[in-house]
Each structure stands twice: as C-alpha cells, then as structure tokens.
C-alpha cells in the first residue's frame, strides 16, 4: 500500500514537471512561451540568485557555441525607478531613469568581463589575459561573442474609459503619472520618455552606442495596436536628440550608429488582414530603415487562399 501511494506521488510530480517543459496542444505558442519564462524568472528569485548570476550563466551557456559572433541581451526598462520615494518632478525622474539605464549596461558589461576572467583564470596581467582568451578561442574551447543590449518594451493590455474615469487625462497633461499605469496614453508617454533618455545617453557617452544597439517591442500583439508605440520609435530617431558623431577623451571623433529597430508584428492576429495592416503600419509610421527588423511577421508567409 505504501509503495503504491509513493508511486502515485511520483507520477503526479513527474506529470507536473513535464507540463512545464512540453508544450500542450491546447495552449497557443506565445502564451506558453510567456508562462514558461515567467516561471523561470520566478525560480531565479526564489533561489536567491541575483541578476548578476543570471547574466553569467547566460554567457556561460551561449559561449559554448563558438559560431555565435553576436549576442543580444534584452532588458526591460524599470519605469518604477523614476517615481520611488515620491519623486514626481520630471527632471529628477529623468535623471533616475538614465541612472537605471546606465546601471543595467554596467551590470551586463561587468558580468561579461567576469565571465571572461573565469574562463582563463585571470591573475591581473592584461596582456597575458588577452593572449589566453585568444588561445582559448582559437582552440575552440569557448566563444566570446560581441555584446549588444536591446531595450525591450512589452505590449500590455490597457484600461479604456469604460466607466467614465478621465483621470488618465490629468496624468498625461500634468506629467505626474504614476510609475505603473495601464492607461494607454500614460504608458505610451513613459515609453517615449525612456527612449529619449536612451538616445540622449548614446549621444553623450563615447562608445555607449556600441553596446546599446536597439529597441524591441514584443508580447501579445492583440493587446496593443502599433500606433501606441509609433511615437516612441519616431522619437528615438528624431534629429533634435540624435547626433552623428561624438568626441572621446583623446579628441577623436567617433561615429554614432543608428539604433536598430525590432517590432514583433504580424505574428498573432484574429484575421490575416489585421496582420497585414499591422505590418504595413509599422513600416510606414515607425521610420524604419534598411537593417531594421519585423519580428516573425508570420502573416507574410500565410497562403491567403488557404486562409
């Protein structure tokens, strides 16, 4: 009797485990993807691991493939940081946001350097360290891809004015919006302020543009229309805040590359015409250039007659 109960418990645990690893047929792909990685993030927090440890594990796992030349690190901006401790003034909120962005970049670069030191047992001599890294790469023991940070904005379900609540108008007009709000215009303004801060930093700190390389918008496409994020994409390439060159400490002029665009679109739609429309709006209204990306854009590969 005891062995039977023990076996039943084993089956239950095994079933619960595989439910999280094997995608069932009744769950759509994107929803499963979101649920799985949300649980993974929560597991890291429960285990007491900080972000630094997570970054190092990412580098360790990805660098095993020496064919990887570039590695994108996606970071979601912390909008809550701007309004901690009751800070509401725009100047202070902007400064806090820029500080948060720079701390994120510093954390990624620092952990990548620490990973490289861990690979070859760094002992303080830079020239020897570089030689060891080159030999490690040439021998095929590990890869060292270049790092690119992409700021990732999530499309969210928003609250409309179903009950006549017009407080979001006051938020937008006064500039004292709460850090987290689902009112669509408040959320859009926060994203615009964030991309403006990103580009101002890229244009004022030498070499930073080589690390912050792009912005991305993903998550459930049906939650938010493209027009919600169009102002953010246009703002970050506005000539009023972008600069073509920057001078470093040695007096050399450095070219500032354009930030890259990715927008996940045409991947989840109720009708194929909606998918086509979203793709068209992104290309037409987001100031896209050569090299910018459409995320998946599955609608373009669908046979219309079969649909």
Residue ranges and their predicted role:
Residues 1-307:
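Metal-cofactor-binding active-site regions of metalloenzymes
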